[in-house]
Design a protein with these regions (language model features):
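Helix N-cap/capping motif at the beta->alpha junctions
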Residues: 33-42, 63-65
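Conserved phosphotransfer cores of two-component systems
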Residues: 45-47, 71-77, 99
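Receiver (REC) domain active-site loop signature in two-component systems and cognate sites
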Residues: 58
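Two-component/phosphorelay signaling modules centered on CheY-like receiver
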Residues: 11-32, 46
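Interdomain helical linkers/hinges and coiled-coil/dimerization scaffolds
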Residues: 97, 103, 109-145
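Alpha4 helix (beta4-alpha4-beta5 surface) of REC/receiver domains from two-component response regulators
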Residues: 41, 65, 77-78, 88-103
């Protein structure tokens, strides 16, 4: 089960995201929510998350700044990140891509687009796990030889 942190300054969006899909059926568990990027970073100090779904425009620290901070952090750089935005402006998407955002979904969030993005992340995680298994397998073989 991949752990998800939702980040949005609108409580009704957070509620809606929790109810939009069957998270467990898709292999995800919502472990928390935050109202802005700063709150998200505080959450991550005491909790683990594999994926963050974040709004772009929020007070205190926006989603792009959160993404930037995660990518320069040794501890958090590998967290998957999906932007949820009401802005179709290419500039925001370009900035998100620059910092290795895994997907960019326009609001209002459509169920199918969210499921598609989550499945893409789950696929990336499966590839990552398979590579780790192969690496461990090779190391075990090396020690036996």
């Amino acid at each position: 089960m991949l752990r998800v942190l939702l980040v949005d300054d609108e409580p009704f969006i957070l509620r809606g995201m929790k109810e939009l899909i069957d998270w467990k059926n898709e292999g995800f568990e919502i472990v928390g929510s935050a109202a802005d990027g700063e709150e998200a970073l505080l959450f991550l100090q005491n909790h683990d998350a594999d994926l963050i779904l974040s709004d772009i425009k929020m007070p205190i620290m926006d989603g792009l700044e959160l993404l930037r901070k995660l990518r320069i952090s040794e501890k958090y750089r590998d967290i998957y990140f999906i932007i949820l935005s009401g802005y179709a402006d290419f500039q925001y998407a370009q900035e998100a891509i620059k910092y290795a955002c895994n997907d960019y979904i326009l609001k209002p969030v459509e169920k199918e687009k969210l499921v598609q993005a989550l499945r893409k992340v789950r696929g990336l995680k499966n590839i990552e796990l398979e590579k780790e298994r192969e690496t461990l397998g090779c190391k075990e073989l090396e020690t036996k030889v």
